[in-house]
Amino acid sequence: MYWKTVGVLTTMILTLSCSKDSCPLSSGNTNSEIRELPVFREIILYDKINLILMPDSIQKIRVETGKNLLSGISTIVDGGKLTIQDNNGCKLLRTDASTVNVYISTGPLEKITYHGAGDVGSTDTIRQNHFTVDCVDGSGSINLKLIADSADAIIRTRNADISFNGYGNYSFIYCAAEGSINLSHFVTRVSNIESTSIRDIDVNVTGNLYASILYLGNVYYTGNPVFIQSMITNSGKLIQLP
């Protein structure tokens, strides 16, 4: 009886606290809108939103989802940083599900800070002097085509996956928790790796390889590096692949 009463009260509170606009119970038909925004160099991504990057000289942002959810997908630029969030309420009460896709054409993008559960990809190669993907607490997959003089792939918590395809001069990799990073198709001359993850890291290095393996995940490498320096303090291993 107690839990039944709690359930009824919870439903009443949710129903009363959510207006039709802030708490759409139906996503509606898929729709999209173009948004004009100031120039940005970093994207901060939250929630289950898929991000599709389309490198271009002209900046353009298109948001695609159910028409009842569009207004709740915020895209705000502050200090050169674009923050993308799903502010729609009452997700658990919604009668249907709708994917949220954000398509971004931009040239000066240098960093993605990831807190989300959606997937991130690129339709063409991103070209930058320095590019960073920093997964602060994300749980989706990030797969980018990239050419950069230096590239950072960072997973701090949770179970995100990062993969780059392309080449660069230097890569920095930090992988913790249940994350995995695959740079086997991103050829670099120098790679500096720190692994505290239970999952694996893959790299392709032709010059110097520096690896600190502090937990269970292995580091697999190809590319025949000319110099290798490793520190291993747990059961993870540094393994060369043919």
Show where each model-derived region lies.
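Solvent-exposed adhesion/ligand-recognition segments of exported proteins
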Residues: 65, 73-79
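Extended, compositionally simple hydrophobic/Ser/Thr-rich segments
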Residues: 41-53, 102, 109-242
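Short acidic/polar N-terminal linker immediately downstream of export determinants
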Residues: 18-68, 87-105, 120-122, 236-242
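Single-residue recognition of alpha-helix boundary sites
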Residues: 13-15, 58, 226
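Hydrophobic alpha-helical segments, principally membrane-spanning helices and signal/leader peptides
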Residues: 2-4, 32-35, 64-65, 101, ...
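Sec-dependent bacterial lipoprotein signal peptides
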Residues: 1-18
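Short carbohydrate-recognition loop motifs
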Residues: 80-87
